[in-house]
């Protein structure tokens, strides 16, 4: 999993509330088990017309936000069905952080397991960040996981809280497999001891 320590980049404003996982990655793209390649279908029905042409008004189709790494979103982001393809698609597009007043629990947990930092902040702070994001490509927002702060392009800094274990995993690029591999020597030792004690197994 890709490490997350600090990201400075363009933040895309998405004030719509209740953006669900079917909006993030529609069901017709869930047949794959590959984590790569889903970025082109992120927000598919919001980004594209039925003929495949781009909808120019959609924020990620606008030149200022095509390379966004951060999304500042409306309330209850990631609600709906528990598809892990949603964070896969966000990450494949290049999104490393989503800031909102609240997230659906399963989506929130899946983000941490896939290298994305979901940040919960009070409504008044999210509104300040949303306004900063509306300034476009000239406005660079910084998300510092080590310091646990979000800093706007004009230098306003806001603290956020994140579970210490999840913070450790993100900063060290550890998903569930990575955490298991950290214990590889102990696991190998246990298996050797078990083979000695129970050679018939």
Curated annotation (Swiss-Prot):
Pathway: Amino-acid biosynthesis; L-leucine biosynthesis; L-leucine from 3-methyl-2-oxobutanoate: step 2/4. The keyword Amino-acid biosynthesis applies. Its EC number is 4.2.1.33. It comes from the Bacteria. It catalyses: (2R,3S)-3-isopropylmalate = (2S)-2-isopropylmalate. InterPro entries: 3-IsopropMal_deHydase_ssu, Aconitase/3IPM_dehydase_swvl, AconitaseA/IPMdHydase_ssu_swvl, IPMI_Swivel, LeuD. Keywords: Amino-acid biosynthesis, Branched-chain amino acid biosynthesis, Leucine biosynthesis, Lyase. GO terms for biological process: L-leucine biosynthetic process. Disulfide bonds: none annotated. GO terms for molecular function: 3-isopropylmalate dehydratase activity. The keyword Cytoplasm does not apply. One of its GO terms (cellular component) is 3-isopropylmalate dehydratase complex. Heterodimer of LeuC and LeuD. Belongs to the LeuD family. LeuD type 1 subfamily. Catalyzes the isomerization between 2-isopropylmalate and 3-isopropylmalate, via the formation of 2-isopropylmaleate. This is 3-isopropylmalate dehydratase small subunit. It comes from Cereibacter sphaeroides (strain ATCC 17023 / DSM 158 / JCM 6121 / CCUG 31486 / LMG 2827 / NBRC 12203 / NCIMB 8253 / ATH 2.4.1.).
